[in-house]
Design a protein with these regions (language model features):
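Small-residue-enriched hydrophobic alpha-helices in membranes
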Residues: 1-43, 50-197
Length: 197
């Protein structure tokens, strides 16, 4: 799937989060991904009831990877962070499903991978963060071998199946994002390097 269809539910939710009157033609696929990523990342950050400086720094580093020179996306991202915190969207599974609905299988996998990166920001994955990410992955229909490959890439606890690793490498390949947004190509490259793929 090379294009993402932004439906009226996504437009309504993004408008509510940002406080802006958005329309489908003005919403870049990158912004949809960034909004979903912020929701997942903020959820990981608050799941263990302690937000540490390392997690705040990781959020900023992730946004550096995901944002380009587009002032409009940058401004909408700032509004999105405030809106997601205000609405506590990370605790609303239906809202997260609505945001992630337009995303491709590859983008959903990338989203979960950024969640795992956030969960290791303070040195280890808290059990509550891990359960939150498993729940997110399940809702996004991320296949278990793919989830295990990502988790193993950040924890080095259990070796993943070679097939799972190869499938994740393919799903995070540049060709999966080239026609959507060049920033997502860069984000996938970044994540492959983090996962040593």
């Amino acid at each position: 799937m090379n294009t993402w269809q932004v439906n009226s539910e996504v437009v309504y939710l993004l408008s509510k989060i940002t406080g802006q009157d958005l329309n489908p033609r003005s919403i870049r696929p990158l912004f949809v991904f960034v909004a979903a990523a912020i929701a997942v990342l903020r959820g990981v950050m608050v799941m263990d009831k302690v937000v540490v400086a390392e997690e705040e720094a990781r959020l900023l580093e992730t946004l550096d990877v995901l944002l380009d020179e587009d002032d409009e996306v940058y401004n909408l991202t700032q509004l999105t962070i405030r809106g997601i915190d205000r609405e506590q969207l990370f605790l609303d599974p239906q809202a997260l499903l609505t945001l992630s609905n337009p995303l491709s299988v590859s983008a959903k996998l990338l989203l979960v991978a950024f969640g795992y990166e956030m969960s290791t920001a303070d040195g280890s994955i808290d059990f509550r963060e891990q359960m939150y990410l498993h729940s997110i992955a399940s809702r996004l229909q991320v296949e278990m071998p793919h989830l295990q490959a990502i988790e193993a890439g950040f924890t080095q606890d259990t070796p993943p199946s070679p097939e799972g690793v190869e499938e994740v490498r393919q799903l995070l390949g540049d060709d999966r994002f080239e026609e959507i947004d060049p920033i997502l190509v860069k984000a996938a490259q970044y994540m492959r390097s983090k996962l040593k793929m």
